Amino acid sequence: MTEKFRKVFGGGKPVIAMVHLGALPGAPLHDAERGLEGLVDDARQDLTALQAAGVDAVMFGNENDRPYEFTADTASTATMAYVIGRLRALIAVPFGVNVLWDPMSTMALAAATGAAFVREIFTGHYASDMGPWTPDAGRAVRYRNRLGRSDLALLYNVSAEFAWSLDRRSLPDRARSAVFSSIPDAVLVSGAITGEPAELSDLLAVKNVLPDTPVLANTGVRHETVGDVLHVADGCIVGSALKVDGHTWNPVDPARAAEFMRLARAARGG
């Protein structure tokens, strides 16, 4: 386990819960009538429910900003900073941020809000719904350090959603190479889209080649599968399973979140 990962999450297998912000100003699905206060109110409700359920950490993301872009609008990043700032006094667990699909904006948002970790696609070469995808880990990680946040833990998603890798190497080889070349603090394995599970066989294959690097399930972990996932992986990021009816775009269901954490604690032996 890497030092930064341990410092942020402790020695266990963390459950990182998503706070999916509503569509931000400028995005096609933004609710202009409810405006910024609506974004804050909805995020506060989800954050409160997740923390009451006992999640280990939360991550703020802009999954509702569809169609997605590789370079986030400045207003989107600023709005995310505003919402997180309004909630900062209520956040009682480590928190992270992710501005889809923009590593530079994600780093800037983390620096502005004091986030402990970030998630993004930092490496690889993909064909995606958004077009050709060629992130630049070297540029992003250097930007983190220029912002004075060398302490920021980096969670690298090595199997991008909404995309197909153009790299002919196997997923374990891509993950192993990313750890060697681009110094992540953890590696994430995803399903095809938000809410769809990563294959347990993929998690196991990546973990087998990275015994000293945290490997987390990034998508699609459900109540029925969290035990099996945490048997293989070093933690998980979960969003859809904690929502009303298990639907990604619904608010958090306090009862579903509490039951998920009960199952996670049992799987972790506590």
Labelled PLM ranges:
Residues 51-79, 125-130, 184-197, 245-247:
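Glycine-rich, proline-tolerant flexible connector loops at the mouths of alpha/beta enzymes
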Residues 113-131, 182-194, 219-222, 232-256:
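Glycine-rich phosphate-binding active-site loops on the catalytic face of alpha/beta enzymes
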